[in-house]
A protein has these predicted regions:
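C-terminal non-catalytic regions of proteins with extracellular/luminal or membrane-system context
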Residues: 1-298
Length: 298
């Protein structure tokens, strides 16, 4: 996926080469401008067909380099037909990496512990081993014609990422109850061989900065309005952007309410060492819900 048009996703026909910046092209351009020797090795243009021989050859090639970036995920290009692993009319029975991509990552990790994984995908990928053993994972999605430039800027630190997940990543396809509207009095029974928490929850996302939250204050209700504030400190050496998220939970209700409901968020730029007070303002109606008789109430 590092040097093809999988970054375009489904429902996009074949594009001219000069109209799309692949991930390799983006990394190569920025890397060479910084004095790095950047090279590319294609394990197999068909994700489904990566073989043990392909993996062995890739690993032998990678031994000569100080840093390895492996691009894995799905390929939903409509014009590829039999080589597609995702997209419309391409159902999947699991959320794992297709073929032997995980084995490829594991073998590369054996020769270089600083492997970075870049995902190109249009759906969640459930690979707990990668989360546990790989030091850096970039979720690039199918981000379009300039995806290569965007990914390269993140990898080289020219851009400090600050995105948050718009959905939940379960640990496996069997983690069916990965929901936020179960009864607050009881989550659900434990799995025999699986954790009950997701691999990555809704709203998760890391950056090169580290943000600490403190001084959370909720005002009294005045004229059906509530004010909430929280101090956010960037205690890292990097200026960064943080998406401050405000969630609401109704602990006692006549009907089952979500245990985690996003009601407000703000994206803020916070310099290294800086503390900002973030204010949210809610109307009571923002917390309203329909009761058992379908009447709107708070």
């Amino acid at each position: 996926n590092s040097n093809n048009h999988s970054v375009l996703g489904d429902w996009v026909w074949a594009q001219p080469e000069d109209k799309v910046t692949t991930i390799f092209e983006g990394v190569s351009k920025i890397g060479k401008s910084k004095g790095y020797n950047v090279d590319f090795y294609d394990s197999n243009e068909d994700i489904r067909s990566i073989s043990d021989i392909d993996i062995k050859r890739t690993v032998n090639y990678a031994r000569n380099y100080d840093q390895i970036v492996v691009v894995v995920g799905d390929n939903s290009q409509r014009n590829l037909k039999s080589k597609r692993t995702a997209g419309e009319n391409m159902g999947r029975a699991n959320l794992n990496l297709s073929g032997k991509q995980l084995q490829l990552v594991k073998k590369l990790r054996q020769v270089n512990k600083d492997v970075i994984v870049v995902y190109v995908n249009g759906k969640p990928i459930a690979e707990p081993w990668i989360d546990k053993n790989i030091s850096g994972v970039v979720e690039s999605w199918e981000s379009g014609t300039t995806a290569g430039t965007a990914v390269a800027e993140v990898l080289f630190g020219d851009m400090n990422p600050g995105g948050k997940l718009p959905l939940t990543f379960p640990r496996s396809v069997g983690q069916l109850q990965m929901i936020y509207n179960h009864k607050p009095s009881q989550y659900f029974h434990k799995y025999a061989f699986e954790k009950v928490t997701p691999l990555y929850p809704f709203g998760h996302g890391l950056s090169y900065s580290n943000f600490e939250y403190s001084e959370f204050v909720v005002s009294e209700v005045v004229n059906d309005k509530i004010s909430i504030s929280v101090d956010v400190t960037n205690d890292s050496e990097f200026d960064g952007e943080e998406v401050v998220q405000l969630y609401f939970r109704d602990s006692y209700s006549s009907v089952t309410r979500p245990v985690k409901e996003l009601v407000r968020y703000k994206r803020v730029v916070i310099a290294s060492g800086e503390t900002k007070t973030i204010d949210f303002h809610l109307d009571i109606k923002d917390l309203a819900f329909y009761d058992i008789n379908m009447n709107l109430c708070v």
